[in-house]
Curated annotation (Swiss-Prot):
The lineage of its organism: Bacteria, Pseudomonadati, Pseudomonadota, Alphaproteobacteria, Rickettsiales. The chain crosses the membrane at residues 10-29, 75-93, 98-117, 130-147, 157-179, 199-221, 236-255, 262-284, 289-311, 323-340, 355-374. This is Uncharacterized protein RP255. It is a multi-pass membrane protein. It comes from Rickettsia prowazekii (strain Madrid E). Keywords: Cell membrane, Membrane, Transmembrane, Transmembrane helix. The keyword Ligase does not apply. One of its GO terms (cellular component) is plasma membrane. It is found in: Cell membrane.
Amino acid sequence: MTLKNDYKTIFFSLFGIFIFSCINAINFYNFKIFLLIKNLGGEQINNINQTKFIGSIIAGFSLIQLINKLSNKRIILISLSLLIICTINLIILNNYTLIKINFILINFGIFSYFTSRTLDIIEISKEKKYLFLACIILLWAGGNLMVDLLNPFIKPTNNTIVICALLYCINILTEFLHYNHTSHKLNLNSKFSSLIKNIELQLLTGFVVSYITLNILWYYEAFALKKQLALINLKLILKYIFLTICFAIIPICYILSKINKYFANLSLNIILLICFILLPIHGTNKNLNILYIILIGNCLGAIFICNILILIDKFQDYELRTALLSYFSMCSIGIYAGALSSHVPYGTIKGSDFLFSVFAVVGSFVTYHFWYFIQYKLYRF
């Protein structure tokens, strides 16, 4: 495939990521209100919000079997078709159980689409991988910021649901405007156990990053109220994070591509832990509160990208696709673990317990990461 076709494919792939980000942001801001209109109770909505992440885990295990048998394009088209059907179902369905199953299927489609789209971009971008990985995060943040600006004009009605379905249709149309060249040469001599051993640290990192992200989304407001922090509103916090990501993510990814990624990974995790330690101490100061939130958001994004770059350096073709999918699957398990932890209502009763959860996960991981770094002499890479 020519360089011109490569960039054409990447352009449409990134455009698809942007549209997809907008749709997910619309759902994020309006999902609860829309379900309340359907006369669902608060407990039912919370249960849907938790169990929907099962779809990502199911998708992860399913794609491990299919990712090297189906092209990225075919998986993307199947995912988008499923998302269109499930989105329209939101208008039709009124039964609580069916709505819950529908949201599980939506998350199945979201995970499958995002994973396949990211693999598509990685396989095409060659030596520019760090740049286009940064663009994925940049456009995801940009889509969220755009919807945040337009949110006063977006109402949780059936018309909004139809618009989301039409945006998915636009994504499908863009798939027919470029060529997909996914390779499917299976290396039957490859030992999966050896592959897993080589990505052990990346899998654990994926779990930690996604678990912490979910904890912030779920518990930060209650924690901030308890500690009387300067910033309490989650939407405002996300706006600060997305704005800084838009400006910082490309330079961050460029730096990561040039330095020892294992050392960068360890350093970012240590910075993350320090920010969580200092947040309750200095968080009553608005400027410091904003600084720590920005650092936490950018650290999580940089760690996510750093581990993808590590996997790209380690593997090729079949092994790379399997390793990346395993990484994304572990991220989905981390998200679900974070959602399950909300069964214990420490987010609303004892906000300080939010920190205990974070310290337990990040602190133990940083300790293990440091041992792993020294044990396997990763500082030499």
